[in-house]
């Protein structure tokens, strides 16, 4: 089937399932339906062949299976999938969220910015209207007050006129569009800095909230609430795990308990724990940023007070950079306020996905099943096997990593989110945290941890067997794909948040590094005393000399000539580059002498008659 035709079929299936769910009174998002369709197709028990074209009967069966799972509202597995889909669609890391937030603000200010930069005002009324638009722009961009508040507008107008009077609009209109936008941003930051300084001095700040005080109250309260929920979730995890471990050795308890349902509840609460840890980590990062920015804000305000004091005029080069820094810090505080609000809202909206716990596992039943069981925390489980370590000599073909031999040991991406792969495969889905101190197995560029030494040895005997078991289990319980981070094995179900963090899957362990050592020539400082004297008479001589110095007086002498001497200075012309040019060389072509002699050999006559012929050409002929 061509890709376009397959997409059309999938869209029609999703639309049909959505309509059927709505007819049964259940409103389901298309994202959740699409995820459920892929989950049903992946489950081998449903009998769908991925390499074969779906027939009409297959489509009807697929719709029926999806409807059954989506309408089973009291199923922990469905709640986990809903939680995962909601979190993936609504969570963004801090950096990307703030970038998107700033982009949205810029787009909202686009129309106001264009009205200012494209303005061609000439008349007085038009210039006044343009100036009012600039005031509105400054207010909207800074987010400190409403443009409809008269007091706020007056305060902004006064601050703007002190740095950008209306008379300078003519110069502003001659600038290019980019320069206008840049100047508008600078004016906004300077005006914001002036208002913040006036607010700190008690002379203004109309409509400006005390963001540091608000954040110092909101962040600890949010962290405390999330911490409480996180501890409650972990307590529930430990109790579920203890009951499942007890049921593994008690057939009667297994028949009564329905372990598969309890395991789905365990996956649900474990996923909730993971999401709470992500949210809490972001809030802790925000708290650290707020603390640092609050200190910087106070330092800048104090610097401004020391610079201005009671002066009537201060150079702009001294105060404008501080005003801009104040504005930047305040904008960052505004960003932190929004981030905390979004994270708190996300935390509130994932809590309803835990509703099935009280329904299927009430407190009374839990206490009855826990009778005689030992509830262990994750930390306790790790401490039990802290001293048990894998012996590398037992494995010649496998590589094991340990904290003392791996530089980035804590940064390695552990498979299955750090849970023990052997325990999960051997117990049909029980989640126990792995202990990295036992040793991390590196197998095909992936890293695995185990909760005990025996589990590590068992997994190392046949890793592929246990990896296949985990993969098949994830096909039946699709929520495990995101919980155990199996996205690379099921690329069709990779969530958007995992696609953005794809680079983190390629962190390699650092087990070797270049190093060098050098021995100091003298480790200890020298102890030789140069002024030491062993001769008694030399010591006596120095003592007499020092005693005589007490009776001496320092004198100065000046002659008749020396008092006239003074420091002298001379001045010369600085060197400069010069050049000379000689007469140019020339040449002339003189004729070559050509003189011939005849009759030197003599002849019949007794007298030799010598003839000299000069054939040299004249100078003017050359």
Swiss-Prot record:
Organism placement in taxonomy: Eukaryota, Metazoa, Chordata, Craniata, Vertebrata
Keyword vocabulary terms for this entry: Cell projection, Cilium, Cilium biogenesis/degradation, Cytoplasm, Cytoskeleton
Pfam families with a match to the protein in the record: FAP206
Segments for region (Disordered): 571-592
Record's function text: Essential for sperm motility and is involved in the regulation of the beating frequency of motile cilia on the epithelial cells of the respiratory tract. Required for the establishment of radial spokes in sperm flagella.
Family note: Belongs to the CFAP206 family.
Cellular compartment(s): Cytoplasm, Cytoskeleton, Cilium axoneme; Cytoplasm, Cytoskeleton, Cilium basal body
Name the record gives this protein: Cilia- and flagella-associated protein 206
A GO BP entry: axoneme assembly
Mitochondrion is among the record's keywords: no
PANTHER family: CILIA- AND FLAGELLA-ASSOCIATED PROTEIN 206 (PTHR21442:SF0)
Keyword Glycoprotein set for record: no
GO cellular component, one term: radial spoke
């Amino acid at each position: 089937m061509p890709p376009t035709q397959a997409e059309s079929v999938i869209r029609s299936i999703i639309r049909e399932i959505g309509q059927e769910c709505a007819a049964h009174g259940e409103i389901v998002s298309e994202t959740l339906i699409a995820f459920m369709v892929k989950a049903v197709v992946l489950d081998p028990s449903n009998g769908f062949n991925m390499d074969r074209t779906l027939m009409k009967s297959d489509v009807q069966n697929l719709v029926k299976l999806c409807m059954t799972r989506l309408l089973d509202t009291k199923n922990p597995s469905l709640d986990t999938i809903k939680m995962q889909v909601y979190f993936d669609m609504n969570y963004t890391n801090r950096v990307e969220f703030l970038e998107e937030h700033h982009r949205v603000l810029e787009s909202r200010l686009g129309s106001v910015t264009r009205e200012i930069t494209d303005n061609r005002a000439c008349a007085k009324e038009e210039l006044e209207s343009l100036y009012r638009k600039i005031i509105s722009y400054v207010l909207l961009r800074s987010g400190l007050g409403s443009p409809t508040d008269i007091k706020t507008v007056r305060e902004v107008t006064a601050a703007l006129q002190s740095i950008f009077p209306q008379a300078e609009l003519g110069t502003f209109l001659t600038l290019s569009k980019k320069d206008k936008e840049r100047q508008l941003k600078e004016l906004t930051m300077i005006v914001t800095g002036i208002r913040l300084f006036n607010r700190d001095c008690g002379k203004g700040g109309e409509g400006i909230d005390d963001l540091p005080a608000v954040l110092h109250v909101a962040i600890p309260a949010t962290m405390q609430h999330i911490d409480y929920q996180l501890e409650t979730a972990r307590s529930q995890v430990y109790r579920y795990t203890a009951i499942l471990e007890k049921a593994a050795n008690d057939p009667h308890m297994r028949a009564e308990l329905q372990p598969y349902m309890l395991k789905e509840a365990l996956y649900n609460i474990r996923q909730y724990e993971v999401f709470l840890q992500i949210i809490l980590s972001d809030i802790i990062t925000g708290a650290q940023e707020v603390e640092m920015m609050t200190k910087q804000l106070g330092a800048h305000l104090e610097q401004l007070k020391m610079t201005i004091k009671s002066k009537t005029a201060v150079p702009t080069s001294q105060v404008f950079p501080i005003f801009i820094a104040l504005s930047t810090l305040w904008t960052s505080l505004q960003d932190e306020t929004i981030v905390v609000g979004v994270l708190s809202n996300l935390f509130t909206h994932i809590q309803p996905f835990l509703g099935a716990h009280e329904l299927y596992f009430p407190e009374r039943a839990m206490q009855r099943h826990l009778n005689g069981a030992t509830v262990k925390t994750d930390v306790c489980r790790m401490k039990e096997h802290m001293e048990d370590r894998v012996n590398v000599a037992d494995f010649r073909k496998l590589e094991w990593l340990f904290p003392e031999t791996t530089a980035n040991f804590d940064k390695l991406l552990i498979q299955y989110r750090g849970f023990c792969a052997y325990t999960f495969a051997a117990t049909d889905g029980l989640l126990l945290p792995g202990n990295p101190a036992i040793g991390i197995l590196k197998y095909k560029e992936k890293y695995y941890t185990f909760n005990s030494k025996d589990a590590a040895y068992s997994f190392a005997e046949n890793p592929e067997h246990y990896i296949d078991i985990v993969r098949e289990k994830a096909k039946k319980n699709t929520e495990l794909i995101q919980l155990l981070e199996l996205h690379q094995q099921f690329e069709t179900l990779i969530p958007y948040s995992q696609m953005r963090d794809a680079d983190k899957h390629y962190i390699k362990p650092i087990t070797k590094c270049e190093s060098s050592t050098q021995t100091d020539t003298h480790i200890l400082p020298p102890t030789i005393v140069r002024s030491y004297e062993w001769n008694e008479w030399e010591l006596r001589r120095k003592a007499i000399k020092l005693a005589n110095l007490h009776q001496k007086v320092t004198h100065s002498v000046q002659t008749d000539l020396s008092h006239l001497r003074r420091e002298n200075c001379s001045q010369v012309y600085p060197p400069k580059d010069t050049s000379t040019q000689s007469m140019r060389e020339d040449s002339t072509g003189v004729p070559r002498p050509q003189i011939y002699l005849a009759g030197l050999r003599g002849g019949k006559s007794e007298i030799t008659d010598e003839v000299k012929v000069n054939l040299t050409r004249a100078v003017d002929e050359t």
